[in-house]
Regions:
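Beta-propeller folds
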Residues: 1-171
Length: 171
């Protein structure tokens, strides 16, 4: 907002095409909070709503039921400085789990969660940055990503399995 003016109030609404009913989600958002992304999951009863506090140092991921309007906090990620925007575009949802980037240990790494919000595994680890999460191949069990593992000046494409076996795919 412009200096001296109040923040806009934001909310999430859904519209049922069959019943022509609009519903407001019961999202416990700070009065001056942001909603930077809303994404569909693989489950029609779970809408992913991503929120940030005003200082942008706390990220919350809620799963909302579009019919009941109930929202459940699945994940909270905090930073002593700020949450980078690439976190929102690197969250991917699968039928039983989701994966996302986080800098909670000081480096950007890939994390794998159950749809209940429980951490299954920190997929990547080390003194390097995962720049982009490219996807997960459910058949082969590989996560694909780009990172600067060899040099902070260049990035390469890698795949890693659930046990941590990593393969560099680019030159």
């Amino acid at each position: 907002p412009k200096a001296g003016y109040p923040n806009s109030k934001v909310e999430v609404r859904t519209y049922d095409i069959k019943s022509h009913v609009t519903r407001t989600m019961k999202l416990p958002l700070d009065a001056d909070g942001y909603i930077p992304r809303i994404r569909f999951t693989k489950d029609a009863n779970k809408l992913a709503i991503m929120t940030l506090n005003r200082h942008q140092d706390r990220f919350d991921l809620y799963f909302a039921d579009p019919r009941s309007t109930l929202c459940k906090l699945m994940l909270r990620d905090e930073s002593p400085y700020y949450i980078k925007e690439n976190i929102f575009d690197n969250i991917q949802f699968y039928p039983e789990y989701f994966s996302m980037l986080s800098e909670r240990d000081g480096y950007s790494h890939l994390y794998w969660y159950s749809m209940g919000g429980n951490l299954i595994k920190k997929v990547t680890n080390g003194k390097f940055e995962v720049k982009d999460f490219l996807g997960y191949d459910e058949e082969d069990g590989y996560f694909y990503y780009t990172s600067n593992e060899e040099s902070p000046l260049r990035k390469a494409v890698y795949k890693i399995d659930k046990k941590g076996k990593k393969t560099k795919l680019s030159q």
